[in-house]
Amino acid sequence: MKHTLNSQSSDMAGLYTLSLRMVIGWTYFSAFWRRLILENKLIPDEKGYIGEKFNHFLPNALGIKPVIEYLVTHPDVLQRSMMIFTIIEAIVGLFIILGLFTRLMSIGIFSLALGILLGSGWLGTTCLDEWQIGVLGVAGGFVMFLTGSGPYSLDHYFKKNNKKFTQKKWFQWLGSGNFPVSDPKGFVLAGSLIILGLTLFTNQYFHGGVWGTLHNKSVKPKLEISKISHQHSKLTFEVYRTEGADVYGSFLIGIHILDKNGKILKELDHKELAGIPKEDIQNHHVAKVKPGKHSLVIPLGAKADVTLNIDDIFQKNDIHSLKLIDVSGIEWIEKID
């Protein structure tokens, strides 16, 4: 009798989370649907390539930055990883919708959401959308692990038809049914507090959302200039965009080479920057710095060595610093070591 009551309770818990299961399942399955069925976004160097979106996560990712950096500097590995990642999202999302091996798939939801949170939780131009997707996915995955799926699921269908594997202990952990912990209160409380702690920590780390001053690294572009050197008729520097909106680039409309008094020794305007030869730009990542129609375009996460011709600067020893000017009016100046 007790087993029957427990079974009914677990079925009802799974029933109550049906809408959550369907919606979360679709959010992950739809990633596969968008990238491969509606459009093919897994082809490098084509518009909408998912690898470039992944590159946008790099500058301010938490804890997984070395992994992202390795992938975006190895395009072949990145493409394979994006394919595998998309297939995993499809399987996890579809199985969650169908209620098949629900608890195992909920671990997949938890893991995918955690990856989104750590990688892209800092993005969001008008609201904290990537962070919200991440923390809600983590919490939703945990809830579905606790409840399993109810009557409208393949797990329930297999149990109802007395399939042998549903009687195994592992099915309770990986499928659905009675939660295989005799007193789950401590487990639920501990898990919930850990997820709350993760939520508060990442909210503060990425956005200052718990105390102090709010900050949003997606509002305006930020460029880091380094490794400036000049030899004979060439000046080379490394530029790396670490902040700003991920949906469009920083548009450089001016570069000034200055002396120690701030006097302009050489100036490149937007037309000259739009005409920089591609061989003078050596990109490090899949998100590429490249000449645009009216400027030099620098996407979020892009890093490149840019070479300028300074043959027309006669007193090269006077070169002191480099200034980059964005179309928004923001300027960045870096001294030459």
Describe the residue ranges of each PLM region.
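Extended, low-polarity transmembrane helix blocks
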Residues: 1-60, 68-69, 76-85, 101-337
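Core segments of transmembrane alpha-helices
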Residues: 88-90
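Transmembrane alpha-helix interface/packing and boundary motifs in multi-pass membrane proteins
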Residues: 92-101
